[in-house]
Amino acid sequence: MKKISILGSTGSIGTQTLDIVTDHPDKFQVVGLATGNNIQLLSEQIRQFRPQIVAINNESQLEDLKSLISDLDYTPIILAGKEGVIEVARYGDSESVVTGIVGCAGLLPTIAAITAGKDIALANKETLIAGGPVVLPLVEKHRVKLLPADSEHSAIFQCLQGVPTGGLKKIILTASGGAFRDLPVEKLPQVTVADALKHPNWSMGRKITIDSATLMNKGLEVIEAHYLFGVDYNAIDIVIHPQSIIHSLIELQDTSVLAQLGWPDMRLPLLYALSWPERIYTDWEPLNLVKAGSLTFKEPDHQKYPCMGLAYAAGRAGGAMPAVLNAANEQAVALFLEEKISFLDIPRVIEKVCDRFAIHNTSTPSLDDILAADNWARQEVSNCLIANPV
């Protein structure tokens, strides 16, 4: 029985992780839950899974949460604020922490979990994108496992099992192409928030769905793959695969190509991250190749997806530049979701912020440097819009 804590328990990653726990009560026990604002769903999760410790990031909702569970026959530890989330991350009884918090907000709790000796099921890619130079040495120092829990990096990780050192030649990340994969470039200026949120294959949160539409999600995954697998950016490719059946591939030195296939279902990579190196039986629908039909591929259009090139450039620049890219993207996507900028403004804003940061970048940033760069980039997005409206 593995004891786990879940950061972001009411979001897409968190609820699907809890589905896994429900399906496998003999394998996993929830000891900690943390979320941002959704106290109604959190209270229901507390009733069902009876964690030992919970946290709500929004401190103003603490008393309301306590009231919602006041009739329980047990009393979990209930905390609030960023420090409360960090306490859940490093809570003593948990063996593994699922990091499902969206964005750079997941960085400090993940670091707290690592320094407390917890294995990490990494569903928060921003942890490595922004904090890779700091996080990876901590993983090595504290001898914990950092296991990818998103579909693409889990696919790569699975394909690499048994590949000898030096055998890997190239990583190939597959992308659905997002909501606008079949839309002509000239029609992008007219797209709305509602249009961008219509992902053709995956059910995900709002922010990551927009990232999929811009292909920034895949660009961020390139940076994450670089850190996770130690592969040069020149050896990481992106290919559009509309069916989302092949979750990613690796090419070996002898030109053999290995791939991991399955229906688009986030539960599979989450389960593997929690159960590795075991393979746990499930009654989920297996992939039927005949039902899936044809699998198609095409090169991504760099004119249509400029965010992809911005991510490669930030990754190659290194230092704190990926943190700046990530923060600028988070802010730009939030503004788009609020209908304050257009869809095409997202890459324009990001490029401006990254260009302005270039002279400030350092090759070996500390955690404080990374956090400062993150804060700077968020403010700079506002400055860009005030000084030079996009």
Curated annotation (Swiss-Prot):
Mn(2+) binds at D150, E152, E221. PANTHER family: 1-DEOXY-D-XYLULOSE 5-PHOSPHATE REDUCTOISOMERASE (PTHR30525), 1-DEOXY-D-XYLULOSE 5-PHOSPHATE REDUCTOISOMERASE, CHLOROPLASTIC (PTHR30525:SF0). It comes from the Bacteria. It comes from Microcystis aeruginosa (strain NIES-843 / IAM M-2473). The lineage of its organism: Bacteria, Bacillati, Cyanobacteriota, Cyanophyceae, Oscillatoriophycideae. GO terms for molecular function: 1-deoxy-D-xylulose-5-phosphate reductoisomerase activity; manganese ion binding; NADPH binding. It catalyses: 2-C-methyl-D-erythritol 4-phosphate + NADP(+) = 1-deoxy-D-xylulose 5-phosphate + NADPH + H(+). GO terms for biological process: isopentenyl diphosphate biosynthetic process, methylerythritol 4-phosphate pathway involved in terpenoid biosynthetic process. This is 1-deoxy-D-xylulose 5-phosphate reductoisomerase.
